[in-house]
């Protein structure tokens, strides 16, 4: 399965022309794995990587720096001051179509990445494909305390997603005593069909405005078709993704806890830097 997974990702990468490339690098498993396989596919292609954060010692900056050095990219660390953040926010407010958290971060990265190449790669889709969200693994309906009385008893943080799932007909799954395999497959499809487009739409919209081509090697119809053939327990918790990533990446990168790109500038840093 590991070999087939790698083959499928590389097939997506091979659709990208071997010209100078830009890549959004958070130092997490998704973007780092994409970088590793892009470098394997195109060993001589110039690659410029971009990391956005609120300070130079932000975890994403530290891990991305390590990965960029490993794969010999032209790496850029972008730290945004409050005043510069407002500048970008004002520009983005005039053109934005969506209002999702972290959209401005995408706009800033695209702004800088285009300076090197109008072809940009991202690790988007990894959480959805490889079961990176808590709900993929959380033992819903297997509560030792018995019947669940409220949404907060399931999990307090993602209430908005739980409420949306209830509206979509997942109430029985969330509150019943035992969950079936079909239920978990339905949750996986929920993230693919509903959340993934919400994550990608702001990126694609910004890319269109800035005349950038976006490639997501971890998210395509053919790739999803392959992932659906895997046993559910292999799909969730990033199990198969981590096994592949360990072939190319340090364990510290593969096993690190995800912070979330949408909070990379909360709060903004003290100065703007572009190296």
Language-model features: locations:
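Active-site- or binding-pocket-proximal scaffold segments within functional domains
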Residues: 269-275
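Substrate-binding beta-hairpin/strand module that engages nucleic acids
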Residues: 256-262
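ATP-dependent adenylate-handling active sites, centered on carboxylate activation for C-N bond formation
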Residues: 1-188, 194-252, 263-269
């Amino acid at each position: 399965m590991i070999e087939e997974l790698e083959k499928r990702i590389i097939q997506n990468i091979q659709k990208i022309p071997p010209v100078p490339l830009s890549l959004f690098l958070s130092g997490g498993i998704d973007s780092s794995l994409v970088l590793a396989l892009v470098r394997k596919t195109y060993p001589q292609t110039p690659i410029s990587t971009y990391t956005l954060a609120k300070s130079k010692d932000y975890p994403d900056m530290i891990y991305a720096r390590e990965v960029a050095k490993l794969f010999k990219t032209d790496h850029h660390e972008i730290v945004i001051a409050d005043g510069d953040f407002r500048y970008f926010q004002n520009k983005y407010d005039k053109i934005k179509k969506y209002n999702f958290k972290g959209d401005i971060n995408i706009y800033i990265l695209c702004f800088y990445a285009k300076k090197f190449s109008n072809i940009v790669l991202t690790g988007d889709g990894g959480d959805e494909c490889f079961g990176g969200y808590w709900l993929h693994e959380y033992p819903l309906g297997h509560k030792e305390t018995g019947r669940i009385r409220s949404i907060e008893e399931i999990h307090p943080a993602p209430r908005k997603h739980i409420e949306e799932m209830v509206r979509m007909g997942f109430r029985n799954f969330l509150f019943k005593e035992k969950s079936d395999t079909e239920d978990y497959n339905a949750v996986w499809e929920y993230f693919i069909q509903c959340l993934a487009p919400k994550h990608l739409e702001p990126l694609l919209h910004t890319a269109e405005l800035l005349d950038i081509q976006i490639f997501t090697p971890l998210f395509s119809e053919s790739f999803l078709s392959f992932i659906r053939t895997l046993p559910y327990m292999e799909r969730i918790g990033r199990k198969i993704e981590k096994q592949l990533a360990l072939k190319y990446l340090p364990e510290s990168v593969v096993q690190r806890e995800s912070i979330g790109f949408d909070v990379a500038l909360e709060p903004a840093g003290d100065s703007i830097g572009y190296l």
